[in-house]
Each structure stands twice: as C-alpha cells, then as structure tokens.
Amino acid sequence: MANNYKKIVLLKGLEVINDYHFRIVKSLLSNDLKLNPKMKEEYDKIQIADLMEEKFPGDAGLGKLIEFFKEIPTLGDLAETLKREKLKVANKIESIPVKGIIPSKKTKQKEVYPATPACTPSNRLTAKGAEETLGPQKRKKPSEEETGTKRSKMSKEQTRPSCSAGASTSTAMGRSPPPQTSSSAPPNTSSTESLKPLANRHATASKNIFREDPIIAMVLNATKVFKYESSENEQRRMFHATVATQTQFFHVKVLNINLKRKFIKKRIIIISNYSKRNSLLEVNEASSVSEAGPDQTFEVPKDIIRRAKKIPKINILHKQTSGYIVYGLFMLHTKIVNRKTTIYEIQDKTGSMAVVGKGECHNIPCEKGDKLRLFCFRLRKRENMSKLMSEMHSFIQIQKNTNQRSHDSRSMALPQEQSQHPKPSEASTTLPESHLKTPQMPPTTPSSSSFTKKDETHPGAQSSPANFRITSPTVAPPLSSDTSTNRHPAVP
C-alpha cells in the first residue's frame, strides 16, 4: 500500500504544484531527506518522491506533504484533496481482513440460495435459468415443491435489496443509479444506456474540476493575436499572456480576443471564472477580466518576475515527464521543412532538442542563429527520445539575430566604400597628368627619371591613377598657389 501513497504524493501532490512551491517543499524536507545545496537545486519531482518513499515507508511522506500544503494559502484546497485520497487508501487497508471472511459467507449463501443476487441483466438471466432448472427437481420430489417455491421467492427478494444497495452506493459516489430493465430486454441495452450518461458526466467533471476563485494578478507580458485551428476545424484567434501574483506566476491562454485591451503590461487585473491546470490558466468566452481598483494594487516580488523570465535548460527538459508544458526562448540551430511539419532543432550549452511544428507553427520564416520563443508546447517521449510537439494553442515568436545582421551589413558595406574612395580623388589624379602635358614642363627632368624607376619596379604604375594618388597624396591641394610644386612632384 505504500506504493499507493507514493502515487498520490507524485501524481496528485508534487506534479500539480509549480516550481516555486516545489522549491519550498525541497527546502522544508532538506533535513529529513538530507539534501545538500546541489541536490536541492538539481533534484526533480520524481527523485524527491523516491527519497520520500525511502525516508517515510509508512505513507511515502504524504502526511508531511499535507502539513506543508496547509501552511501555504494557495494550496489549501490541494491539501484537502490529498487528505481525502489518503483516507481512501486507509479504508482499503482496513477492509483487507474483512475481505478474507466474505468468501466463506458467500459459499454458505450459494448452498442455501442457488440464484446469486445481482443487478446486471446477465445475472438476472442466470437466476432465471437457475429457477427453471429447479422445475424438474420439483416434479421429481413433490414433497419439496413448497420448499422450492419458498426458495425461489427468497432469491427474488434477495436480488431486489442488492439492487437498491447498489443504487445507494452509486448515489453516494455522486452517480445516479443505472436504470432497471426487465429480464426480457437485451443485456447490451441497459449497459450502453448507463455508460453514455456516465461518460458525459466524467467529461463534464474533467472540464470543470479546475475552476478556481477569482485571482488578482499583474500582467507581465502578452503576445499579439494569432490564428489557430480549433477541434471543429474552424479558424479562431487567441493570444498568450503571463501574469503574476505576490506568490507565483501563471501562463495564460486567452481565447477571447476582446480581452486584449485588458492585458496591458504592469496593469493589475482580476480574473474570474477561469480554468486552471497546474500553473496554466485558460480564459475563454465565459471568463471575466476586469481592472483592479486603487485599493487592490500591489508590487510583484522581483524573485517572481525573475522566475517568470527564466529560460529552462534543455538538459532539464529531457528529465521531465511526458506531457510537460514548455514555455521559453531557445536558439535555432537547424530547420528541416517537411510536407506537413517542420523540425526546428533548438540548442543551448546543455544540449539540443527537436521541436515539431505543424499547423500555424509549420514553416515559419527563420534561420540559424535566430531565437524562437515557444508558447504552450508539450513534451513527448518515445523510445528515450524527447521532442516538443506543437498543439492547438501553440505559438512561435521569432527574434531575429540582430548581431549577425549588423555584421553582415558592415561586411557588405566595406567593399562599396573601398570602391567609392577613388571617386573624390579623381580630380587630384587627373590634374597632375594635365600638368605633365603642359608645354612649360621640360622634356627630361629628374622627376621623369624617378617615374621611370617607379615603372621599372612596378610595371604599369604610371597608367594607374591610383598609383599617383599613393605616391603624391599632397600634390592636389597646392595647385592653385604653387605651380612649381606641381611641376616637380615629391617622390617618396
């Protein structure tokens, strides 16, 4: 039975709380579980549950968990839920010795009453068949006819109270008793009729089980409105947001775009009639969002804001259980576009992981080095491989790599600047040529011999204007004032 307690601790206790409350639990259990600082930082919920099972073999630490949750205001309801689950397991343990005695009583009843009491139509038919088999025995032994009649009446009376008992049991568990049908009706009819409303009730309960009281929270951020395809194959619009109270933060799926004007950064709002799963809220058409009054304002602690902005490490995501919802900003390493899906490989210093985008997340314009901000992606594990899968409400926001863009633009502009440099100096390079052609210049001068030497070392240098610009960079400015300088350019 300790395993049943551990299931409650892990699946209904640790799994549904957020990271902040989980850190509180680890801190409170550090002495009992002998957790060092590194273990408190790195151990996940599964590892803590294993240690709790070893330390508290009786109830796997469920009692401790209930005590902690009672002290946290936002986890009071969860503490009551865990308390009820613990009582259920305790009742099962107490009923084990009783079950060992019941079979002997049943065997005695079977000896006295051939028809076993039951509510199902198949058992009713069995009881009827048992009565029919008693018929020949009655004819063979007339002396026992009255006794057989009494027994058949007693068996019928036994079946009726058992049905009413079953009905009361189902009513106590929150379900209406199944409809009673005659023995002539087919067995499948009653079973299908009773199962359909039961399934509908379970589906309704699963939708409404996460309803919470109104909360007052500050808006930290909100995305733009985007399109998504509903389960009815209809194009609808929504947006994501992040809000925070004084004790924790929540990711919000807002399915009513008319509420977009309410979700303004740093605004205090009141959200009511919403649904909640772990630290994820869903606001729809039936929800209500209003601005808080002046007396309801508060400041969100910096630690909460820092944790809301914290990006999960990829190696930590690999350790999470399948179904874990992921939000975060990751670097794109590669992108593979298929016909219906796109594989985005994200990477950080701790590892890499594949992100499968489909629907609105398929083939989004991005390239290596860009950052992908993922909203509401679900972790899936198969054959020791972890992937982030896009779902109906998933969204990808692209942050372009501005550093790479600016570097590329500078590298592209550099050749253009070099090609444009000779243009403003063309006048200075052509002017010496015109002065060299003037009749005032003697045919043979020392400067001409110097140019001849220049040509010998660098053939074709005289025909290149750039060569003149390099050898006599200061020739052009004094043209208007000193012509002698132009006639005899300085040779370096």
From Swiss-Prot:
Q: What induces it?
A: By IFN-alphas and IFNG/IFN-gamma in hematopoietic cancer cells.
Q: Where is it expressed, tissue-wise?
A: Expressed in spleen, lymph node and peripheral blood leukocytes, and at lower levels in thymus, bone marrow and fetal liver. Down-regulated in breast tumors.
The HIN-200 domain is annotated at 199-399
Question: What's a single GO BP term from this record?
Answer: positive regulation of DNA binding
- Keywords tagged on the record: Cell cycle, Nucleus, Tumor suppressor
Molecular function in Gene Ontology: double-stranded DNA binding; ubiquitin protein ligase binding
Please tell me whether the keyword Cell cycle is annotated for this protein: yes
Composition bias (Basic and acidic residues) maps to 142-159
One GO cellular component, as annotated: nucleoplasm
Please list the coiled coil stretches.
none
Enumerate the spans annotated as Pyrin domain: 1-88
Bias regions of kind Low complexity — which residues? 181-194
Database matches in PROSITE patterns: DAPIN, HIN_200
Entry's InterPro entries?
DAPIN, DEATH-like_dom_sf, HIN-200, HIN200/IF120x, NA-bd_OB-fold
**Compositionally biased spans, kind Polar residues:** 160-173, 416-432, 460-492
Segments carrying the region annotation (Disordered) are 106-199, 400-492
Q: Which Gene3D superfamilies match?
A: Death Domain, Fas, Nucleic acid-binding proteins
Annotated family: Belongs to the HIN-200 family.
Chain's role: Major mediator of the tumor suppressor activity of IFN in breast cancer cells. Promotes ubiquitination and subsequent degradation of MDM2, which leads to p53/TP53 stabilization. Promotes ubiquitination and subsequent degradation of HDAC1, which in turn enhances maspin expression, and impairs invasive activity of cancer cells.
The free-text domain remark for this protein reads:
The HIN-200 domain mediates interaction with MDM2.
Q: Kindly state the subunit structure of this protein.
A: Interacts with MDM2.
Q: What is this protein called?
A: Pyrin and HIN domain-containing protein 1
Q: Which organism is it from?
A: Homo sapiens (Human)
